[in-house]
UniProtKB/Swiss-Prot annotation:
Gene Ontology CC annotations of this record: cytoplasm
Keywords on record: Cytoplasm
Record's protein name: UPF0298 protein GTNG_0961
Family per similarity comment: Belongs to the UPF0298 family.
Organism ancestry: Bacteria, Bacillati, Bacillota, Bacilli, Bacillales
Ranges in a coiled coil: none
Top-rank lineage group of the source organism: Bacteria
Organism in which the protein naturally occurs: Geobacillus thermodenitrificans (strain NG80-2)
InterPro entries per record: DUF2129
Principal location class: cytoplasm
Compartment(s): Cytoplasm
Pfam families reported for this sequence: DUF2129
Disulfide bonds: none
Length: 89
């Protein structure tokens, strides 16, 4: 239903070119202090967009976001850890 999206972190030399990143995807965040932008595009186009962004003269570095590949379901604590002989508080 929804297309798979992936974030791309773009490190910039100057922020005045931040608006030019709109044509590569949806800009999610721009950090003025650290001079980077986070933009999202379709997963199928990530490699193509990263190559185009890296070729721009105002871009220092381009990194993909690894969030889609991380496991976000966490397991609960085991029974041993729940029944501690030393109560806290």
């Amino acid at each position: 239903m929804f297309p798979k999206r992936q974030g791309i972190i773009v490190w910039l030399h100057s922020l005045k070119y931040g608006k030019q990143l709109r044509k590569f995807g949806n800009i999610h965040y721009i950090s003025k202090r650290l001079k980077y932008a986070v933009l999202y595009c379709d997963m199928e186009q990530v490699d193509h967009v990263m190559k185009k962004l890296a070729a721009l003269p105002f871009v220092k570095r381009v990194e993909p976001s690894y969030r889609p590949f991380l496991r976000l379901e966490f397991e609960s604590k085991g029974e041993k850890e729940k029944d501690s002989p030393y109560p806290l508080g």
